[in-house]
């Protein structure tokens, strides 16, 4: 009697059974993990519309127990299962994507004054996409590490690697989003974070196993720090052209500063320090908006850019020029009140042990951050050639990362113009200007918006975002 065939069949059936069992266990893990992340009974959450959201930690380094905190919102679209996934990053370095992006700008909930309640944001970007807000780098917001050396070694490469590891692990936890079109979005110093993460994903996709593949389609950045030379040149020219500084100060800075060099002369430092002191009476992030008057000990106290009126501290300019690119100080006060409530932290599954007090911006991150990359233009060139869709938008009332510098950066790429500079419209009014370039790059201005475009011009920001995602032209007529 030949028992060979039945034995082979038994082994085959055993293997199939084990694979099915492993698949079921894996599926159970996903369901259990997502259920544990689900946010229920968030204090002060509006009852309508019904919004499904999740929050928690993803470990990106087992050795140092380095964990990044996220807040994820499913799209409010009629078909959320078909909508893309968008990762949002705020800058600083050191500012929270939850305090700004999620709770003050484009998330579905906005913190109301004094952090006592939430209001529904009808112009939230969750109208168009599944939005994932990440507190990065480690040390920002609720994200934490058990190793102090992590905080001493932060630089752009470190941050990009952690963000990449986060996304790989997050997709393993939420596999239903793995095949979606994936975009990265952000503002300010995310002008570094976003393209660097995009580049890392692009490079890793070519060599990593299939289960680590990320379906990256492009990125969109607002008022982004891009190139030190052009950004700093733009700061000076914007301040002069918008009557913030005198002709004499402008001429002095222009004469003494070589913006191509990272080692500025003392006369240049003195001149540029003076430029920033002229902004102390107004809001540099939105020069036409009323200045928030607050005695809070939150991020609002940093608006002086570290300038000591009795001692210019010229040697500290390089840190000061990078001071938190992007916040409304009053909104940051409200966010700090809300996210330090014990009931809120418990609802969001945020640790109270590793993070004693949540801050909208962590100044120690800025002080220890190693600025090793002066220009993102080579990365832009690489990713444009790779075929990624890239949009740069700029609120034209921002004095910190002004539209002038961003225009210099885009022009320096040397890409042929596909569609000439024109106006775009929203609600029968000019929303801003737009230029399209060959290769998928688009530059858009938003009229009357400051550094935080979704906060200052929420309707226009949503229209712009919708156009970016859907590949639709912004209206060229009222």
UniProtKB/Swiss-Prot annotation:
UniProt cross-references to PROSITE patterns, sorted A to Z: CARBOXYPEPT_SER_HIS (PS00560), CARBOXYPEPT_SER_SER (PS00131)
> Does Transcription regulation appear among the keywords?
no
Location in the cell reads: Secreted
Give the source's domain of life in one word: Eukaryota
Q: What's a Gene Ontology MF term here?
A: serine-type carboxypeptidase activity
- Keyword Glycosyltransferase part of the UniProt annotation: no
Q: Where is the signal peptide?
A: 1-33
* Disulfide cross-links: 95-361, 257-268, 292-330
EC assignment: the record states: 3.4.16.-
* Carbohydrate attachment residues: 114, 146, 263, 295, 362
Record keywords:
Carboxypeptidase, Disulfide bond, Glycoprotein, Hydrolase, Protease, Secreted, Signal
- GO CC aspect terms: extracellular region
The free-text tissue note of the record is: Expressed in senescent leaves and flowers.
Q: Which Pfam families match?
A: Peptidase_S10
Q: Which InterPro entries match?
A: AB_hydrolase_fold, Peptidase_S10, Ser_caboxypep_his_AS, Ser_caboxypep_ser_AS
Q: Name one GO biological process term.
A: proteolysis
Q: Which residues participate directly in catalysis? A: 188, 398, 451
Which SUPFAM superfamilies does the UniProt record give?
Answer: alpha/beta-Hydrolases (SSF53474)
Q: Please give the family membership noted in the entry.
A: Belongs to the peptidase S10 family.
Q: What does this protein do?
A: Probable carboxypeptidase.
Know the name of this protein? Serine carboxypeptidase-like 33
- Naturally occurring in which organism (per UniProt): Arabidopsis thaliana (Mouse-ear cress)
